[in-house]
């Protein structure tokens, strides 16, 4: 009996107490991946909401441009019809205001930043942004003119842990607010819409 006790010593009470943490460690091992996956789902859902609102904003901006470009010059500081100067005209500001109103809920709660309204070529989806004075020919019996508008925003990734996984960090500092990306990652979201341009005139009382 003495030899058996020497070969198989009884565990001390302290050793039994040390083994009680095994269940907690196993819980952490199983819980953390599931919890991280849940956070990533929330972050992806928020980005999907931003995507939907951006698409809606692009459509509203295209519809506004189709009306504003051919509208009465008296309402836009005497600017010529069928013409729009990017970032330098009252007509462009009116189109941008329509986009900002559509994006207002996400702007007010800080989900999106740096809203940009660009006008690529009507025949080039995803094309580069055009600058300067743009001219648009009203549609006729042989040609359907179109206005293409793209809305570009930076979506803020707020969900902890998941924002580092879903939204990659950017180390390019080209803007004064780019340093915030180190603390709060951003994800670019873009959406385009195209709308026929009739060049219709409107009568006002």
Regions found by a protein language model. Give the residues of each.
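Glycine-centered recognition micro-motifs in short, flexible terminal segments and loops
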Residues: 7-32
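Broad hydrophobic/π-residue packing in well-ordered secondary structure
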Residues: 26-27, 39, 49, 153-156, ...
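N-terminal alpha-helical signal peptides/signal-anchor transmembrane segments
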Residues: 44, 57-73
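C-terminal juxtamembrane segment of a hydrophobic transmembrane alpha-helix
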Residues: 28-48, 59
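Short, conserved structural patches
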Residues: 1-9, 67-205
